[in-house]
Amino acid sequence: MPILLFLIDTSASMNQRTDLGTSYLDIAKGAVELFLKLRARDPASRGDRYMLVTYDEPPYCIKAGWKENHATFMNELKNLQASGLTTLGQALRSSFDLLNLNRLISGIDNYGQGRNPFFLEPSILITITDGNKLTSTASVQEELHLPLNSPLPGSELTKEPFRWDQRLFALVLRLPGVASTEPEQLGSVPSDESAITQMCEVTGGRSYCVRTQRMLNQCLESLVQKVQSGVVINFEKTGPDPLPVGEDTLMELCRPSNLFAAQPWHSCHKLIYVRPNSKTGVPVGHWPIPESFWPEQNLPSLPPRTSHPVVRFSCVDCEPMVIDKLPFDKYELEPSPLTQYILERKSPHTCWQVFVTSSSKYNELGYPFGYLKASTTLTCVNLFVMPYNYPVLLPLLDDLFKVHKLKPNLKWRQAFDSYLKTLPPYYLITKLESDQILASVGKKPPQEIGIKVKNHSACGLPLAHNKSFRKLLKEIIGESAPRLTELNPKEFAGFQVGLLNKDLKPQTYRNAYDIPRRGLLDQLTRMRSNLLQTRKFIVGQDEDSLHSVPVAQMGNYQEYLKMLASPLRELDPDQPKRLHTFGNPFKQDKKGMMIDEADEFVVGPQNKVKRPGEPNSPMSSKRRRSMSLLLRRAQTAPTVTNHVGGKGPLSASWFPSCPSLVKHTFGHPDTTVIHDTHEEKMENGQSPPDGFLLKSAPAEFMNVSGESFISSQLDSLSDDFTGLRKDGFIHKPGNNILLGGAKTCSLSVADQKITMASALETVPNSMQITPAMAQGINADIKHQLMKEVRKFGRKYERIFILLEEVQGPLETKKQFVEFTIKEAARFKRRVLIQYLEKVLEKIDSHHLLNNVNHINSRSSC
């Protein structure tokens, strides 16, 4: 739970005006409110705690501390007045004391037992000042001095007043009082040159020199990004520089270098990110960073330690060591010259060991407790915290598990005892817990052995023996046994439960004079508890006070959010989140509108039912943009009355791929439909077959490119119709596929009628499709087409298969294609529209060809 403490300068110099007429104090108040709004965008801001401190004398400088809520914070912020001195040192000391008030009790600092990065209370101090001279009641100060005396117990254990999880950022207002005519400089905001800058850098923060309102907004956005969970560590190099890595190693060695020049990456003062656990929301760790002294029992007191530990790294390349089942901690380093140098070496399989000086009893530098290593993708540098002196411990544990099988010999025990002598005492608790976990892997937990108490009760004795024993005891000593009598439920046969008194009425007491005298005190207590609303049970409805909140308190969402339960985690984190489509089921992400296929970027299921009240008639397209190129219709050829597909029987085909269509239309038992015909071609971006061909269509009806035969190639198929008779279709041996359909277009009208009639006679009555059945099939196909068009991706095979199954004349099939084009235009399926327009053109050309052949056949007769 981050703590955000705002330290506002309330000195008299904050009353100066800017070129906009507002005072510095007004700008500071507005900056705090804007920061809260920017921070509220992050869902993690629900656990933020806000504090407000001014430059007044303590303890009056604390306006909102640990006990005040968000409403008090906002009220105190609005009521601030600038009328004091610029006592920055005292205000900073009061702010740090306020943050450290509960640290000794909570045990976060863990003095003398190592520094645990996962025990932290991340705090951000944001001070807003004008950067003028520091003043006090005595004189004007040139430098910033923090008082060393602190009333908090345990403050003497740390040399500095701040801790390693507390950072200071300063917004120094330098806004001019007269509008500047010079153009505003773009880029990053520079640091200020006031005395507070050094204090910010010591804590791991920085200062901002604000000269315009735009720079102030830029600084606030940067500060929102700085709210991270982590601790600040000093990284310093020890030993020689590393050898260069790469092909130019020899050239680098021959090149002269200044050995005494300090590089920026030799010493870095940066943050390491301590990420909270995704399940619990609290950071979890195992190993501490060692102390810079060896704790002993004869020490009179613990030596004070620095706020930021000094971690030294050796530039000798080592192999990263990790064994199974041994936990380790991993922390990411903030970008710095050190991380940049390690990443530029491009060696993710080597590491640099880290040490803490004087952490060991026998070695001044100490033993390694972890290492720095670049990530495998070379995007960041991580600090791995391992057990102390892990190069010795890990091989021992590896032998214990793999060689000795958890049964160590004498040699292993001696080596382990010598390792324990180099281990600081505070590591033993952590290591024993870890070893206990490792030893319990694959074993059942031991049963807890409790104290067995003998039961002296005579409940197990028979009832007759128990009665005779008590009777004998009474005769001997003259009294009953000095213990509780054991009740037998069978002895109370006439026991009855008291019934509810029906004459007793509920005591509502609407009139105070109806309360009897003996119940006045009891009723007064109940009335008081009801008035003060001190009940703890669940209220079925909201209180009336929630609906009559003043306007000034309507924006106080913090207190309401604290009462809400934390949201549950996602059941499947890998599943993409569903797009919020309130009021519009077809709402899409804005980034999807910048490409041709907008449906590729839609998140969530797309199988949604069409909204009621939106008909499919051509009149519904008037609400769309008339200038859209997606709605242009294909040029239709002049139509001539088709006597075959008109009022006659249902045409079995409407495209040259008639065999598969006839087979599917009449529902032959041997028919199979396979939808994966052109799936690979569709995924590669190539065009699908122009005709509606199923995989079950014979190969002789398709050319090399996958397109259907056109009218010029129909003559070559005349041999297939030599066996056509007037009594029915041809049945080829070994293949139960009905042939015919569109190929009959070259015959006479009479032959066509006879052929269709005989075909219907050949097929059983249960398999004939009536007009009512065809209408129902088409309605179902229309509904499926609407669902297929809305689906994600570019797999259009199912759409073409559904269009193949449309029942009715050629004009009906043409209407279905036009309807599919309209649906595709609603979802901006440009590629699908192009395919459908090609199909529509082929339908028109085929329709025209049928009519020409029909006229030629009549003229020949």
Curated annotation (Swiss-Prot):
Q: Which domain of life is it from?
A: Eukaryota
User: Is the Phosphoprotein keyword given for this protein?
Assistant: yes
Database matches in InterPro entries: INT_SG_DDX_CT_C (IPR029307), Integrator_subunit6 (IPR051113), VWF_A (IPR002035), vWFA_dom_sf (IPR036465)
UniProt keywords (A-Z) are: Phosphoprotein
Stored PROSITE patterns: VWFA (PS50234)
A Pfam family hit: INT_SG_DDX_CT_C
Protein name (record):
Integrator complex subunit 6-like
Modification sites for Phosphoserine: S617
Q: Does the keyword Phosphoprotein apply?
A: yes
Residue intervals of the VWFA domain: 3-227
The record's gene field reads: Ints6l
Coiled-coil annotation reads none
Q: Which organism is it from?
A: Mus musculus
